[in-house]
């Protein structure tokens, strides 16, 4: 039986010891899949002692059903349910703390409360609080009628539950949850932000609401992370800011990542990937080499944890971990 910690404890312990550890992010299985693929992804890296593992939360998507008469119906279906369940399965199997993601989109405050109760019962004492993206049938993000519009509201709800306060206010409480709350930060500014300064003020609101640490969106230029941390500190944000890295694995990333995440691809990395042509193996090597370079510089700067975005493909993370950690 492993000792239950929370992510903030883990980050602070690494800081106190002067070491850098790594964490990574997995997707829950597609509906109909079992746990094998997720466990294999963890098996690839477990020997390098990950600090913790994140598991993403996915909204519903549109699915078409064709009737016998040829007419089509569209339904909202979650293709990747099971975030809480697979998080508990990983934590129980490996004794590594797991951080389920929880989003605002598509959920009422009561849905969120029920999910948090399940997490608490299962020994999941960490959560990453996110607004989430627009639903498949939405042009822009629309909150549930009984839900939250912004991540800061979700943070407030989780922090309130830690104090024994529930949505309906009618519970005779004798047990308080103790979630460590993470939130997202954007070194290159959230797409919906009015300005970089406003974006940092929104982050400060999340911290003041109860967030314990920040995980950044992916970046490929460490200078942008260091500048972001400086600006956050100047704004009075003192919690740990964990850098997020993603190894490039496809030439398409040169186009899709900036378009989707407003992420800058440095010219040196772009040239290295373009020089690989359509050779997928060479592209992966270039992505690994760049991530190793980034991780070594971040480690030298004393960051306590580096978070890797993986899409559940962890073979390259194992190679990076072997080289850096």
Q: Which residues does each PLM region occupy?
A:
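Flexible, glycine-rich active-site loops centered on histidine and acidic residues
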Residues: 109-157
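Active-site mouth loops of central-metabolism enzymes
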Residues: 21-39, 97-110, 180-198, 274-289
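Glycine-rich, proline-tolerant flexible connector loops at the mouths of alpha/beta enzymes
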Residues: 29, 48-81, 135-146, 211-228, ...
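Catalytic cores of alpha/beta
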Residues: 108-121, 198-202, 227-230, 250-256, ...
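Conserved, mostly hydrophobic/aromatic
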Residues: 25, 53, 119, 206, ...
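N-terminal amphipathic alpha-helix/helix-capping segment at the start of soluble metabolic enzymes
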Residues: 1-24, 31, 166-179, 325
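Active-site pocket-lining/capping segments in soluble small-molecule metabolic enzymes
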Residues: 4, 132, 145-176, 183-192, ...
């Amino acid at each position: 039986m492993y000792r239950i910690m929370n992510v903030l404890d883990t980050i602070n312990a690494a800081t106190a010891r002067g070491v850098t550890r790594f964490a990574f992010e997995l997707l829950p299985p597609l509906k109909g899949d079992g746990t094998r693929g997720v466990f294999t992804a963890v098996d690839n890296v477990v020997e390098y002692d990950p600090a913790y593992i994140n598991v993403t939360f996915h909204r519903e998507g549109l699915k078409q059903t064709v009737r016998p008469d040829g007419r089509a119906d569209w339904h909202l279906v979650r293709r990747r349910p099971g975030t809480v369940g697979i998080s508990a399965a990983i934590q129980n199997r490996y004794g590594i703390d797991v951080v389920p993601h929880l989003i605002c989109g598509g959920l009422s405050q009561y849905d969120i409360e029920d999910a948090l109760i399940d997490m608490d019962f299962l020994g999941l004492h960490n959560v990453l609080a996110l607004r989430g993206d627009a639903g498949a049938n939405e042009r822009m993000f629309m909150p549930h009628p009984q839900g939250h519009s912004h991540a800061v509201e979700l943070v407030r709800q989780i922090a309130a539950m830690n104090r024994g306060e529930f949505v309906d206010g009618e519970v005779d409480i004798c047990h308080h949850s103790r979630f460590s709350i993470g939130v997202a930060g954007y070194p290159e500014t959230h797409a919906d932000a009015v300005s970089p300064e406003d974006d940092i003020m929104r982050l400060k609101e999340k911290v003041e609401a109860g967030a314990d640490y920040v995980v950044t969106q992916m970046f490929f230029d460490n200078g942008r992370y260091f500048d972001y941390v400086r600006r956050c500190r100047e704004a009075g944000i003192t919690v740990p800011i964990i850098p997020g890295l993603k190894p490039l694995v496809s030439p398409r990333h040169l186009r899709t990542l900036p378009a989707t995440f407003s992420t800058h691809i440095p010219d040196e990395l772009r040239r290295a990937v373009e020089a690989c042509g359509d050779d997928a193996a060479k592209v992966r090597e270039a992505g690994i080499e760049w991530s190793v370079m980034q991780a070594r510089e971040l480690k030298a700067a004393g960051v306590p944890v580096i978070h890797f975005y993986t899409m559940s493909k962890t073979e390259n993370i194992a190679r990076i971990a072997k080289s850096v950690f």
